[in-house]
Swiss-Prot record:
Keyword Membrane in annotation: no
Post-translational modification: Phosphorylated by DctS.
Organism for this UniProt entry: Bacillus subtilis (strain 168)
Domain called Response regulatory: residue spans: 7-123
Name of the featured protein: Probable C4-dicarboxylate response regulator DctR
Length: 226
């Protein structure tokens, strides 16, 4: 039987932002805020007590920030998903949070519709995962929103596993990235990342953003088409 409700724990140190987010989240059908916390230490206790499905996590907080909190969640192997909502827009923080398993990253200030989209996407993801004991590649692609164009016949030297990794990673980003940044985030060679990005650009999955900055060669940056 399909689940009808998902519990959310909101970890945010600004009381006003916390209240606004709480009020909005409760307007999304099937989602309830089970508890709120003002810092990471309090949040960790509530995760164990309330056992939420999802944590909405800020980064800049006293006592224990969002980075340390997410790392602790993974270290303790707590079964909870995390969406980051933060003003932290530096690539180091964003990459670190995604590498530690954040399923989405929303930058403050944000439009409420962006939060709604994140929650609806999360609900769909959980429903599809929980409905099956085993999954086919096609079902996984649908869950991860991998465009079908990216998993057809690939040129020699490219494989579906890495293609899915690259595409899934790009889908989580809000800004364009260079081949070097993609390579670093996924732990692959820059030239390898460039080959996959070039293929995705040629097939219309992503678009190329050539940036000119000061002296030197222009930098090719890539972003998933909306």
């Amino acid at each position: 039987m399909a689940r009808k409700e998902w519990k959310v724990l909101l970890i945010e140190d600004d009381p006003m932002v916390q209240e606004v987010n709480k009020d909005f989240i409760t307007t999304v059908k099937g989602v309830t805020v089970c508890a709120t916390a003002g810092n990471g230490e309090e949040g960790m206790k509530l995760i164990k007590e309330e056992q939420p499905d999802l944590v909405i996590l800020d980064v800049y907080m006293p006592k224990k920030d969002g980075i340390k909190t997410l790392q602790e969640i993974r270290k303790q192997k707590l079964e909870v998903d995390v969406i980051v909502v933060s003003a932290a827009k530096d690539k180091e923080t964003i990459s670190l949070m995604l590498q530690n398993g954040a399923v989405d990253y929303i930058l403050k200030p944000f439009k409420l519709e962006r939060m709604r989209q994140a929650l609806e996407k999360y609900k769909q993801y959980k429903q599809k995962i929980e409905a099956n004991d085993t999954l086919s590649q096609e079902q996984l692609d649908a869950i991860l929103n991998i465009p079908q164009q990216a998993v057809q016949d690939l040129p020699k030297g490219l494989n579906h596993f890495t293609m899915n990794e690259v595409t899934a990673f790009l889908k989580q980003q809000t800004a364009s990235l260079s081949a070097e940044e993609v390579a670093k985030a996924l732990g692959i060679a820059r030239v390898t990342a460039r080959r996959y990005l070039d293929y995705l650009e040629k097939t219309g999955i992503i678009k190329l953003d050539v940036q000119y900055g000061g002296v030197g060669r222009p930098v090719n940056r890539y972003v998933l088409k909306g």
